[in-house]
C-alpha cells in the first residue's frame, strides 16, 4: 500500500545562511548605520535572537530575517515569535524559536483534519511525524493538497513516499 510521512523539519544550514545574509543586509542598510542591531543564531536552542535600539527597528529586523528565510526555502511560519519584546537597558530583543517536529497536539489536529476529509486513507502518529497510508496514490495526493491548504500555523514537508 502506498504511504508517505508528514514531517516538519528545518535545514539548519539554510537557517545559518539566511542569518548570515540578513546580517549582511543589515550592514548595507542606511537606516541601521551606527545602530547596535544584530542577529544571533543559537543552534542548540534552535532560536534566533534579534537585538536593536527600538521596538520598531526589531520589527524591521524580523522582516529582513523573514525575507532571507523565504529566499532560502524556509517558510515564515517556521518562526515562533513571542508577542512581547524583552527590554534591557537601551536595547529591545526578541528570541524567535524555530519550529521543528510535530507536537502531539498539532499531530492530533492533522490526523483529525485528514479523517474529516472522508478520503480512504489512514493516518497515524509516529513520534514527531504522521504516517499516511492508502490504497490509491490519488488519495494520498489529495491528502497532500489538503495539508498544504490547511492553515495549522506550521510548515509541513512530505517525505518517504512509498508505492
UniProtKB/Swiss-Prot annotation:
Q: Which family does it belong to?
A: Belongs to the YajQ family.
Pfam families, from UniProt? Answer: DUF520
Q: Report keywords, A-Z.
A: Nucleotide-binding
State what protein this is by name.
Nucleotide-binding protein YPO3170
Source organism's superkingdom?
Bacteria
Under the heading PANTHER family, the entry gives: UPF0234 PROTEIN YAJQ
Which GO molecular function, any one, fits this protein according to its record? nucleotide binding
Instruction: State its role.
Output: Nucleotide-binding protein.
What are the record's GO terms for cellular component?
Answer: cytosol
Instruction: Quote the SUPFAM superfamilies the UniProt record gives.
Output: YajQ-like (SSF89963)
Amino acid at each position: 500500500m502506498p504511504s508517505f510521512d508528514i514531517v516538519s523539519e528545518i535545514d539548519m544550514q539554510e537557517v545559518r545562511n539566511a542569518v548570515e545574509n540578513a546580517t549582511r543586509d543589515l550592514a548595507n542598510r542606511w537606516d541601521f548605520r551606527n545602530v547596535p542591531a544584530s542577529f544571533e543564531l543559537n543552534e542548540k536552542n534552535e532560536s534566533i535572537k534579534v537585538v536593536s535600539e527600538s521596538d520598531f527597528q526589531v520589527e524591521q529586523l524580523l522582516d529582513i530575517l523573514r525575507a532571507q528565510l523565504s529566499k532560502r526555502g524556509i517558510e515564515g511560519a517556521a518562526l515562533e515569535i513571542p508577542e512581547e519584546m524583552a527590554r534591557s537597558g537601551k536595547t529591545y530583543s526578541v528570541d524567535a524559536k524555530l519550529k521543528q517536529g510535530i507536537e502531539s497536539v498539532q499531530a492530533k489536529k492533522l490526523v483529525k483534519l485528514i479523517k474529516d476529509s472522508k478520503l480512504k486513507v489512514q493516518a497515524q502518529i509516529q513520534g514527531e511525524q504522521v504516517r499516511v497510508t492508502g490504497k490509491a496514490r490519488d488519495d494520498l495526493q489529495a491528502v497532500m493538497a489538503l495539508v498544504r491548504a490547511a492553515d495549522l500555523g506550521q510548515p509541513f514537508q512530505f517525505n518517504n513516499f512509498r508505492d
